[in-house]
Amino acid sequence: MKEPIVLFDEPEISLHTNYLDELAEAITDVNARLNILISTHSSRLTKNLIIECDTILLYNVKLVNRYSLVYRMKRFPQYSPTSKYRVADDHINAYFSRVNLFVEGETELELFSNPYLRILFPKLKKIDVFKAVSEKPVLNIMNPQLSNSQIPYLCLIDIDKAISFDKTRKRFALKPEYLPEDDKERFRYRNKHESSQYLYSQRKRIEAMQRKLHVHYYLPYLSCDDTNYYAFVSALQKYLLSYNVFCLRTTIEGALVNYRTLAFALDFLKRNTKAQNFEKFNVYWKSLHKTDKLNLLRMLFNGKSDLLRSRKEAFKLVDSEIRDTLDTVTIGGKTSGWVSKYLDDFFKETADEIKDTFTEKKFRKYLESEDKRKHVLRLFEENFFELYSLIERLCGMINE
């Protein structure tokens, strides 16, 4: 045979990872005239072959509507050479996903791994969540748009990834990271029966709003109830969705602590802090404007204010005695586990008919009733409207 072909069907089965590494080396060292075709679900083997072999051709095979579709992928060293030294097995797992959700940090990972949330939304089990948004080389490895893997995906970002606010000039600036350059803007053509806007027109409208927008805010927390600002944010969110970017109004903490969950969040804070500390805080909290109340509470859960002021920045500007009081009731930390407990408590209150110990098994049984499932879904949508919108969009991306 002039050009022999060797076929491997899932060679990773029963192989220890060290042997997989040796197999990858053996494959890359064969005679150039020998063609090797490998069918695999091994992220480690795929990673090693991509890194070690410049001539490898990578294909993604998907079953859609009972038809096998084959897509030729790009190897990440081709379009992002620096990513070669950051790649891990977990990153390559994104090539085998049904849907990818790329997030910023630990809080989002904790949220989407909550068992009660996954029971309420079973399709979340088919969505893989990766911490990648804050690390460009890592995101480049997994980004389906760059790799041409044809896997549906969404990037979840905080609003401060898209805009910044100059407190002195009271002006906003658009950040370029998730906004395409003007000359790379997608022009959307439409016929007379279409009513949706051109992306280009949307972009120009956002830029005009950004230049002209002057907002009113409250100190020291940079709280804002200016309707013009929220119209600007809404336009930006709609535009970014066209580029597979779901932009939150503030942060993921803000999606959990919002004006609908204000009473629940305050009660949660009370249950998880010392009584004497909470009483001192409550005296101060009651004296605040209603917009400041929400912003301060959000900061205590490690979120940011409406105009992106962090807890650390804001607390420097308040009286030292008040600052000490606020420090004693601060509950949010990136790895404190409060998100899990917060959601657990919400679902426990929502399914209050469950007696004794609240468990995953009992909650799953409770939701077997269609009326009760609809009740819980309705309350979740009302209280966590931003999170519900995100989950609905993700679930709609799954090809059954």
Model-based region annotation:
Residues M1-F8, T17-N18, E22:
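GG-anchored amphipathic helix commonly corresponding to the ABC/SMC/Rad50 NBD signature/C-loop
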Residues E3-I5, A32-L37:
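Loop/turn-to-beta-strand initiation segments
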Residues E12-I13:
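Short loop immediately C-terminal to the Walker-B catalytic DE motif
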